[in-house]
């Protein structure tokens, strides 16, 4: 299917599902989806941002600014996933509980506001990974127009660039909870520490990076700093004053990952339960979904 055909398919799907609520994180996919929906549906679409301690303030501000730029209406919903011990205990399917909280709030909003459907930004590449949030979408009947129209991440970036969206070349920005290893509790204090640390790193000009929260050793947690491979040289030059700044925030030790940041793989995988996703949900073309929740 050609790119123009996929665009037409997407716009037809948006018309079919109107009036529509779109889960909007400010990332590449949901930004493009909401921008297209705003063009096609006008006032019959509303973007919904889940606001919680796992969302950096900088990301929230950017999402609101971008939505205003392309003319989409947005509602901020304060979500309470951190109060759910199934989420805060940080299991491997943590993202399921986050998305279930969001989609439940969106469903209530849809009923109150007369919206017909809920949508989110899963794309065609995501269909070949195990994404716990996709199970929540299935349970709450949330549609994925980008995936259904066959649009891949690369195509969405290309179309975003054509539209002039500032997210076209934006690095992946998973929530702050993804910086905390599974099994280590997600707390407000840990999320705030990570957010402050990443603000410092960003202030030094780094573009692709993660500050990984490591389990507490003694009285304070440690951190593992990862930057993109093309920024490793810059990190070595700045480390002598960047590391002390991070330690001053509350880390007992800041390690530099010598391998740098590596994006999670998007390979298609098969297994003995081929054809079934989580919860028995069948994935397109019979592939098992590879997990992509918190490793990015």
Task: Label each PLM-derived region with a short phrase.
Residues 1-162, 223, 241-252, 256, ...:
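ATP-dependent adenylation/nucleotidyltransferase module used to activate substrates
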Residues 152-153, 157-158, 165-174, 207-209:
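Short, structured loop/turn "capping" segments at alpha-beta junctions
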Residues 170-190:
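Internal, active-site/partner-interface "lid" segment
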Residues 177, 215-218, 261:
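A glycine-rich phosphate-binding loop feature that marks nucleotide/adenosyl-phosphate handling sites
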Residues 184-191, 232-233, 266-272:
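Short glycine/threonine-rich loop-to-helix capping motif typified by GTGT followed
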Residues 205-215, 257:
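C-terminal boundary motif of the adenylate-forming
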Residues 215-237:
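A short interface-forming secondary-structure element
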